[in-house]
């Protein structure tokens, strides 16, 4: 820990899990709330409401009127799900499925079949510029930086032990100007990593509060976007995993053609004061296409269907080979932080001596409870690991999970059991994504 890289994940104790929004008055409010909640049942996704909202996005009121039930992430108000059909606009706590499960399924279906929008303003958004910024960033990331303006990559920042500190999307805006996007609660950790390891030539601008962002996802997203911008949107004019500035409702935004939902889609990033007008324009154009709002619960279900890893899997307790994300690594880029340790871990994997690996599982559904992460995984009557993320895949009708398990139990097709609420459920290791395994949908032309 004294070297900046603890052996275990310290997220729950890291003071950087709070930002400058955590003023003295806010701390007093939350301390009182904590005392009042001392004997409450610790339901999954328990939502602490005191001292909120403190960092509402420009869309907060509009989404609240649309039925949003919010969660707080690093001070930001992010929609979890949207109440409709007489369901109360409040948290509904349970260890099992309830009416929220149905609401989330409706949101997933809207994105998969038509088009949906999500307020993703909570993401950490940082701009990096300066002479030599490319060289400095290349020493920090495990993938090759984009070589052309508008290029987009997914990569990881590692510590000196080769463990994962942060997963980050890097966009080359122009020349030596880069835009970095990662999870909300990594904001200060990303800023610290850049300050500690980036060198003196970097200029870092934190856009996390000044900019807002929207996701527009689904097979009809291109049709909706085409009604509000003159920019080319086909594959020839706007390729998959690329970015460019486009105009919407009289405002310039950065459009990133990428999708955490695994569909044709874009993320739209720009100054916060303009994003409500952008949202309203998209909705006016999208009503004829069945546009719907969706929240983080639906987003999580869809990323699980696609086999995309998240914060539960990518911690500073594991290496890139252990997390099974080596497809996002380029070892030929030079001596990035953690490179030698990554190679050593890869060699351990090849030798069969790696302690664990992140496996993708399908679990039998009982229609009542799906699990929440932390469930024991069994093979031939013995514990071989535990789940890190679990969600019901509404599009595929399966409970899906990521789990860190012994490598000998991780081969695709291996029969396992996962203990959900004290009941052993049949499970199997998957070798490909449950939804669109060839990843064709995000690349759809038109």
Residue ranges of model-derived segments:
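Polyanion-binding and phosphate-handling cores
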Residues: 1, 11-13
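Conserved, structured C-terminal
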Residues: 3-8, 42-72, 78-80, 84-86, ...
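Acidic, proline/glycine-enriched N-terminal capping motif
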Residues: 13-158, 163-165
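A short acidic-Thr-Gly-centered motif at the start of a beta-strand
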Residues: 107, 170-171
């Amino acid at each position: 820990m004294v070297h900046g890289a603890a052996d275990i994940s310290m997220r729950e104790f890291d003071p950087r899990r709070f930002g400058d929004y955590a003023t003295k008055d806010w701390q007093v409010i939350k301390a009182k709330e904590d005392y009042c909640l001392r004997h409450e049942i610790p339901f999954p996704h328990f939502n602490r409401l005191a001292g909120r909202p403190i960092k509402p996005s420009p869309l907060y009121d509009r989404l609240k009127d649309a039925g949003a039930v919010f969660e707080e992430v690093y001070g930001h108000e992010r929609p979890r799900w949207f109440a409709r059909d007489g369901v109360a606009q409040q948290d509904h706590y349970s260890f099992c499925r309830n009416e929220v499960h149905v609401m989330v399924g409706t949101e997933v279906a809207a994105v998969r079949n038509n088009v949906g929008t999500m307020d993703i303003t909570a993401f950490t958004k940082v701009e990096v510029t300066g002479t030599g910024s490319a060289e400095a960033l290349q020493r920090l990331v495990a993938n090759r930086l984009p070589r052309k303006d508008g290029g987009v990559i997914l990569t990881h920042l590692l510590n000196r032990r080769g463990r994962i500190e942060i997963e980050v999307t890097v966009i080359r805006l122009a020349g030596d100007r880069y835009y970095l996007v990662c999870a909300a609660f990594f904001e200060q950790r990303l800023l610290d990593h850049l300050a500690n390891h980036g060198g003196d030539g970097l200029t870092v601008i934190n856009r996390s509060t000044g900019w807002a962002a929207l996701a527009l996802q689904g097979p009809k997203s291109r049709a909706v976007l085409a009604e509000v911008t003159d920019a080319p949107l086909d594959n020839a004019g706007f390729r998959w995993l690329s970015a460019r500035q486009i105009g919407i409702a009289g405002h310039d935004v950065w459009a990133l053609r990428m999708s955490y939902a695994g569909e044709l889609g874009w993320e739209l990033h720009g100054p916060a004061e303009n994003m409500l007008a952008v949202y309203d324009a998209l909705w006016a154009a999208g009503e004829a296409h069945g546009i719907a709002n969706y929240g983080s619960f639906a987003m999580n279900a869809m990323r699980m269907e696609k086999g995309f890893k998240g914060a539960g899997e990518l911690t500073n307790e594991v290496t890139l080979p252990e997390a099974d994300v080596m497809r996002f690594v380029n070892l030929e880029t030079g001596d990035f932080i953690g490179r030698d340790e990554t190679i050593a871990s890869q060699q351990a994997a090849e030798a069969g001596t790696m302690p664990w690996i992140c496996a993708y599982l399908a679990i039998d559904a009982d229609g009542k409870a799906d699990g929440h992460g932390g469930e024991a995984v069994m093979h031939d009557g013995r514990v071989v690991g535990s789940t890190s993320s679990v969600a019901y895949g509404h599009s595929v009708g399966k409970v899906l999970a990521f789990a860190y398990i012994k490598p000998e139990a991780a081969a695709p097709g291996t029969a396992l059991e996962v203990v959900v609420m004290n009941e052993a459920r049949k499970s199997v290791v998957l070798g490909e994504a449950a939804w669109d395994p060839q990843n064709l949908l995000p690349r759809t032309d038109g």
